Amino acid sequence: MSDSLRIIFAGTPDFAARHLDALLTSGHNVVGVFTQPDRPAGRGKKLMPSPVKVLAEEKGLPVFQPVSLRPQENQQLVADLHADVMVVVAYGLILPKAVLDMPRLGCINVHGSLLPRWRGAAPIQRSLWAGDAETGVTIMQMDVGLDTGDMLYKLACPITAEDTSGSLYNKLAELGPQGLITTLKQLADGTAAPEAQNEALVTHAEKLSKEEARIDWSLSAVQLERCIRAFNPWPMSWLEIDGQPVKVWQASVIEDATQSLPGTILAATKQGIQVATGKGILNLLSLQPAGKKAMSAQDLLNSRREWFIPGNHLA
């Protein structure tokens, strides 16, 4: 029975907390929780606990917050729990080989893509930006590489034309616990069937940067619309007008050809702000000037029509 396994859980953000909650709700025996140290947050920079820590303390679980698992004394914290398996979900710390080898059944990880596609830090965003038709979660046996371990279980879900990173995150946060609980059952009863990753199919999901989210009008309208959805809700695609950053929350693609230079404003109406791109026209629907709330193109035109005069060029 998987509920008889002694489980260490290691995770930090809300995505991880949802997996911990599923384990506890389904009656699994979580003997200890590792999460990152409290971090300053908000305007007051007050130290705030991670969502995983909040949940673990609510449930009366032992919580450990080492800055690193490299020191011997921190590795001993893991060893002393005598776990059968360690479940790792968006923990954010490297697990040395000594830690990976401690649990009887090793360490398993929930990854937000269908490996070997999109190894790395930003699989959800990269799958959207690439225009993938589907994504999912992979439960894998961890090794010393970055998302290189044998695959134990996969669950797929389609990516719709309306999906943002936020909506896809929520979908995978529902799928992940399902796959995790199934995998734990298979590990417990000896039916797990590890499958090596095909190195020929590997792609890498590099960490996102705010500068990368700046709209590059030389790209096609299709690429830019995907980028806007991929970077929503963070770091948010943006453009610069009058020296001010303006976030773009939503846009649509107009397939019409245009001879105008990329970045040229073609029209500004209540239906949207149409801008020439490297191929096709991008119709900006929802924007957020610095210090303001997100608003429709029509509302922004009512207050800042001078920003969007047809023929002008956006940086």
Swiss-Prot record:
Its EC number is 2.1.2.9. PANTHER family: METHIONYL-TRNA FORMYLTRANSFERASE, METHIONYL-TRNA FORMYLTRANSFERASE, MITOCHONDRIAL. (6S)-5,6,7,8-tetrahydrofolate binds at S113, L114, L115, P116. GO terms for cellular component: cytosol. Signal peptide: none annotated. Keywords: Protein biosynthesis, Transferase. Attaches a formyl group to the free amino group of methionyl-tRNA(fMet). The formyl group appears to play a dual role in the initiator identity of N-formylmethionyl-tRNA by promoting its recognition by IF2 and preventing the misappropriation of this tRNA by the elongation apparatus. This is Methionyl-tRNA formyltransferase. The keyword Ligase does not apply.
